[in-house]
Amino acid sequence: TRIMKITSVAVLGAGAVGSYVIWGLANREDIKLGVIAEGERKERLSRQGCAINGKVYHPEVWTPEEAENVDFLIVSLKYGALPGALESIRKIVGKDTSVMSLMNGVDSEEIIAEQIGKSHILPAVIKVASHREADGYHFDPETTLGIIFGEYEAPYESERVKAVKELFAGTGIHYRSTEYAIEEVWCKFRLNVCNNLPQAILGAGVGCYRDSEHM
């Protein structure tokens, strides 16, 4: 197999999760980094950039057509936005594109796979407490657990997994590969349902599990 090296990365969804990826990869001068946007949003992102942790980053801004056959596509949309983005994903993904979905919910990988085929997808989950303030997105790089990813089946230490590790290495992004990527996705889903739902009902903040004797 040819040695894989990721030289171009597209981020679809430049919100809380996408910001973590942009923040990390913006420092890599050996890759092309772009955010996917069209029309008025493309103009705005090109003009204003992405404000993250008090600094403004200016990744390139690509239409789905301009991003066609990118090496690595990271989908970090809000769950409800996925159906409307499937056509964009189809346009972006070429025969050598790998796709990582960093979305909540357990079926985003399946929904994307229906469009482009499962072989393009590297299952993953992200754990980052990122929130929006007036001056953009904020998170603590030190305490962020980061991105957990791995192949659906052996060989787990695939060319693609090695290429993604190499991409993230030294960027500040926290990451690890695992043989249990699918279980990790379910585990996060369970956490969201079992922790965040009661929290939402009670109107309590994320820290309440550590602080309150009632939770």
Name what the model sees in each region.
Residues R41-S46, E109-E110, E157:
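Short, charged/polar "capping" segments at the starts of alpha-helices
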Residues A10, K32-G34, M100, L122, ...:
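A structural signal for isolated positions on well-ordered beta-strands in alpha/beta enzyme cores
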Residues G18, K42, S108, S130, ...:
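Flexible, glycine-rich phosphate/dinucleotide-binding loops
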